[in-house]
Amino acid sequence: MVQNIDYAPTFLELAGVKVPEDIQGESLLPLLKGKKPAGWRKSLYYHFYEYPAEHMVKRHYGVRTDPYKLIHFYNDIDAWELYDLEKDPAEMHNVINDPAYSEVLADMQAELKKLQIQYNDTDFVK
């Protein structure tokens, strides 16, 4: 899994410039060379702050893995959504209250908290 935060360290490495230790992303060069580094991320964290805006998507943050996505909408609402992306790639069926996903939900909540701390986005960490 790659993110836009990976571009800066990739370009810096390509230019032969030392990548600052506090940069959040990882260089994509190993992946571009066909090698997956040990410990490469298995999940992505994102935080969407802009609302209202043209797209009218409410403020939210979330975590995504290959099979699942957990989202928390906040500010003027407090709503959680969990999607099984293998069964529902269009994210049309929220399974947050489905008992069959209780273990997945707990794992995703733990991963979300871990990533919020890692990226120092801790205003919403409980």
What are these regions (language model features)?
Residues 88:
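Intrinsically disordered, low-complexity polar regions and short flexible loop motifs
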Residues 2:
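Residue-level signal for the nucleotide or nucleotide-sugar donor/cofactor binding architecture
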Residues 94-97:
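Phosphate-coordinating loops and pocket residues in cytosolic domains that bind phosphorylated ligands
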Residues 5-8, 13-81, 85, 103, ...:
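C-terminal cap/loop subdomain of S1 sulfatases and analogous C-terminal strand-loop tails that border
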